[in-house]
Amino acid sequence: MLTFTPITLEHHALLRKYYAGCDYHLCEYSAGTKLMWSLYLRPSFAEEAGCLIVRNRIDGEWVFDYPVPGPDGDVDAALTAIESYCTDTETPLVISVVPEEKAPELLLRWPRLRMNNERNWKDYLYRAEDMAAFAGRKYSGQRNHINKFRKEYPTAKFVPLTGADMPLIENFWADYEQEFQKTSFNAKRELAYAKALARLLPEGWLLGGGLLVDDRLVAMSLAENCGGTLIIHVEKALYSHQGAYPTLVQAFAAHFGGDCVYINREDDAGDRGLRTSKLQYLPVRLAGKLRFEVQCEADRLREIPTVTTPRLTLTPLEERDEAAYNALCLDDARNRWWGYDYRQDLKGELTEDYFL
């Protein structure tokens, strides 16, 4: 049976081993997301059939990511291992953040299921070359904002950020918080998580970059290359420096997006302002994240039916049937006719209400 280990900072190398080549294009399939949002996702992992299997605990419910194969990984075998684990532990089988292109094989695998694909959690995918150039009339708005920024701050320059720049980054957070006006719990939580992720920059696997004006950062991004998709985990700019956001987006894409097809700027979480902003950059695709809740024939029943035959009537068990049902389970003389022996499946101590 699968054995899960909670994901901690020390597992970043193991996660990158799988996510570095993962072509799912979704932000959840990255080391940065698992670590940045670990307090919310409560992720744990197992390795099986050459695949990474991640289990998350969200709102009191276990949900599994779609398996991520290594070079010789067998996704079908990994899915079978998840099925067996859920059967053995009596855990409802829920596969979440499934890439849309993987849906057909799961629909064939599980004919009875409940599926949804919420708009709020779809990731915004952009072509890396579009973000690096902002060419053509359709990007005239972004170019105008960048030109105004360059005119207002002629000495501004883009710089890669490494672990050696942590003092610079800490000063940026202090400046950013002075201008931060959002009061919602989600906004404050996201900022705290972003600051925590930035502290991992010295580990060497995150890609960092920012805009420098007079030796102070006015904007910064943190990202991760996963299978040719540049996943932007953090993207912040000082509100007082108008045009800093599009300037950062373009410069970051030009510097880090050369070997990438897509740039993933993650979801908008239903925030209207964020949605408007992300749409203005003209995504080529809103990448869906499907949720599969696997069911069986019994799940379709609204109530347990009563079945009547000439010899007997089958009805739902009631409290008054407890003693008779318990006696039946322990009746070796009868159970031997259909090969049932409770001792083979007994787990723990045999109590009076064990079978109920």
Predicted regions and their residues:
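Acyltransferase donor/substrate-recognition loop-hinge adjacent to the catalytic core
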Residues: 111-182
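Conserved active-site alpha-helix within GNAT-family acetyltransferase domains
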Residues: 102-117, 144, 269-286
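Conserved catalytic-core motifs of GNAT/GCN5-like acyltransferases
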Residues: 116-124, 284-300
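Aromatic (often tryptophan-rich) hydrophobic motifs at membrane interfaces
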Residues: 205-293
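Short, conserved active-site entrance elements at the starts or edges of catalytic domains
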Residues: 164, 168-216
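Conserved donor-binding loop and adjoining core beta-sheet/short helix segment
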Residues: 17, 28-101, 212-241
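GNAT-family acyltransferases
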Residues: 163-177, 297-356
